[in-house]
Amino acid sequence: MASNSSSGHDVRPPSLTPSEIDKILSMTLIANLATLGEDDTIHIVPMWFMRFGNDIFIPTSRLTRKYKNLKARPYASVMIDISREGLDLKGALIRGPVELVEGEEARKINHQIHLKYVTEEGLNDPSIALYLSKGDDVTVRIHMGHIVNWNLADSKAGRALRIKDRSRQLDA
């Protein structure tokens, strides 16, 4: 991405502004959480999330692989992005140390995250309520130590690909 073209023009896409990063981190999107397993394999899963201050919070269960990985190696990467067809791509990759929050504090945080993704009516459905209350008993707190961002949507190529019929639609 950071290479120059043969004509000497810089082809690096523009970066997101701090307010654009804040906007993406406040949207109802899916975060991709990456942890490192004991055999040095990467475990990556799609997760609900919420940002509070300089931390990203993700609900999970102590029975999951990600919990076991983070208990042994408390460091993670999280990618939160908007990906559409062509080069209509914007996002942030956050890397940092992890704290595992448990007990009543985790229950309260997780409930707030659930409200971001599920309506009150949905939370009152017994099957959904049981799944979320029993399944999400831990909160992963990722301290935003390092943030990398991209904004290919506002690059010259990204704008050109938004012209009708220049890119193919992604499958839903």
What feature does the model see in each segment?
Residues 59, 64-99:
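Helix-adjacent hinge/juxtasegments
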Residues 11-14, 18-29:
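Aromatic-glycine hotspot motif
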Residues 2-16, 90-172:
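Charged, gly/pro-rich active-site loop segments
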Residues 25-26, 71-72, 133:
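Alpha-helix boundary recognition
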Residues 58-61, 68-69, 108-109, 130-132:
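Short histidine-centered beta-strand/loop micro-motifs
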Residues 28-62, 70, 77-81:
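Short beta-strand segments
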Residues 39-41, 84-87, 130-134:
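A short beta-turn/loop motif at secondary-structure boundaries
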